Amino acid sequence: MQVNISGHQLDVTDALRDYVEEKISRLERHFDRITSVQVIMTVEKLKQKIEATLHVSGAEVVANAEHEDMYAAIDLLADKLDRQLIKHKEKQIERQQGQRPADSPVP
């Protein structure tokens, strides 16, 4: 998985980078087909904003979060992405189960 982290009006420190990478790597326990991740952190007045785009097999998962503290915003973002990935995985499973032929023939 390729992780690209950038900051707008913000210097991305090693501590921030490590924290984001740790949170993103935890997402793989639910969905292991994440190919790349784009994370953009911005500062606007008193708000810390973070946006992430995950490229997964067959789709893109996008989430945004904002908070007064960047670390709290990262936590919120990770929670949102976690829920979205679980939902995406469930949809994929439903599609696969719907495509299988029925066990018994229809009369």
UniProtKB/Swiss-Prot annotation:
One of its GO terms (cellular component) is cytosolic small ribosomal subunit. Keywords: Translation regulation. InterPro entries: HPF/YfiA_ribosome-assoc (IPR050574), RHF-like (IPR036567), RHF/RaiA (IPR003489). GO terms for molecular function: ribosomal small subunit binding. GO terms for biological process: negative regulation of translational elongation. Belongs to the HPF/YfiA ribosome-associated protein family. Short HPF subfamily. During stationary phase, promotes and stabilizes dimerization of 70S ribosomes by the ribosome modulation factor (RMF), leading to the formation of inactive 100S ribosomes. Associates exclusively with 100S ribosomes, which are dimers of 70S ribosomes. This is Ribosome hibernation promoting factor. It comes from Azotobacter vinelandii.
